[in-house]
Design a protein with these regions (language model features):
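HIT superfamily nucleotide-processing domains
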Residues: 1-136
Length: 136
């Protein structure tokens, strides 16, 4: 646990939170600034800044928790859909640099930012495929 990380403190019970679920690796809490009713965060108890730092087995476990929580939220809230997302880096919208997964119930009449689909750049795709060989 990092002493100066608010999410380390929230995940490890240093501060009181509205906890929806907890196990030995994760705590799921309600977002303090929710996008919708039922918006929660899956937070690992160990500190990892982003997806590039967390071990593969632990991120796999995090998404198992996310699925379990999303399933329960869908039933309890009656939402029509769910976004599961995780931001990495400031330009990607990460504001707290302790990895966390957002689970955001979506409602038919709800508002939420969506991206505008663009055009596929075949040359860029081919370049990314070629440059990724040996990395994956």
């Amino acid at each position: 646990m990092k002493d100066d990380c608010i999410f380390c403190k929230l995940a490890n019970g240093v501060f009181e939170t509205n906890t929806l679920y907890e196990d030995n690796q994760f705590r799921v809490i309600f977002d303090a600034s929710p996008a919708t009713k039922g918006h929660v965060l899956v937070i690992p108890k160990e500190h990892y800044a982003n997806v590039f730092e967390i071990p593969e087995d632990l991120i796999a476990d995090a998404y198992k928790v996310a699925k379990k929580v999303a399933t329960a939220l869908k039933e309890v809230t009656g939402c029509e859909g769910i976004n599961i997302l995780q931001n990495n880096g400031e330009v990607a919208g990460q504001t707290v640099f302790h990895l966390h997964i957002h689970i955001i119930p979506r409602y038919e009449k709800g508002e939420m930012v969506q991206w505008t689909p663009g055009e596929l750049d075949e040359a860029a795709v081919k370049e990314i495929i070629e440059r990724s060989k040996g990395l994956l």
